[in-house]
Amino acid sequence: ICLYLFKYMVNIIGPFHLAGRSSIKAMWQKSKNSFFITILPVIYNNLSVIVMSIIVSPLQLGFYYGAARIHRALNTLYGPVGQAFYPRLASTDSGNPEKAKQMTKKFLWIMTAAGFLFFSMIYFFTEPIIFLLLGEEFLFASTTLKIFAMVLPLTAISHVLGRQWLMIRRNDNQYAKILLISSIIGVVSIFILIRSYGILAIPISLIIYELLTIILILGFLKRAR
């Protein structure tokens, strides 16, 4: 199937050619901020897991991964929803910026409400969810999952403010800088917290990361008025 689709694509757009140095440089200048916006959260998460796997016991690591799987199942829903909304928002902004602003505000309320719904589901029904999805032996991860639940509404807010509004307003460079600052402080907070709090340090650092991202974005938007 892949070979057929590849051949079909080549028939439509023609054969592939390696880009020249000037073309590569131009593409990099145009897309580098989007690259950093995508890669920085991944680096932050991977560094967090590496640090934790070195310090905590394998048993604690297992509890962490159990709680993280439930958090990630809900957290990954934001991406597809945002991607579906982004083209319409971009199209509206090109012709009517004020309408795009109002649309973003409505989307922010919707995503925030969804975030608090996810938070309420996990926080108030932690043990039944763990028992159903992971098994009784993972009940020791209840506190970890409760803290992960607190991250969900914060992620919803930072997602709309950053990946929707700042990027629509062509503030990719500023957003990349904000994510870099938040990622560095998030990783540093793990080193500070992990000895005392173990696996709880990861969701706590995520709260710090998301809160700092939101505060920095709001500060930038206030200055840019």
What do these predicted regions represent?
Residues 124-153:
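Interfacial segments at transmembrane-helix termini and the short loops linking adjacent helices
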Residues 33, 48-49, 62-78, 110, ...:
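Alpha-helical transmembrane segments of polytopic membrane transporters and translocases
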Residues 67, 71-95, 162-168:
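Helix-loop junctions and terminal segments of transmembrane helices
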Residues 1, 60, 126, 131, ...:
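Membrane-interface helix-loop junctions in multi-pass transport and translocation proteins
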Residues 2-45, 88-102, 225:
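Interhelical loop/hinge segments that connect adjacent transmembrane helices in multipass membrane
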Residues 26-30, 34, 52-72, 139-143, ...:
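Interfacial/gating helices of multi-pass transporter permease domains
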Residues 1-20, 81-84, 162-165, 173, ...:
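C-terminal transmembrane helix end/exit motif
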Residues 152-178:
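Membrane-interface junctions at transmembrane-helix termini in multi-pass inner-membrane proteins
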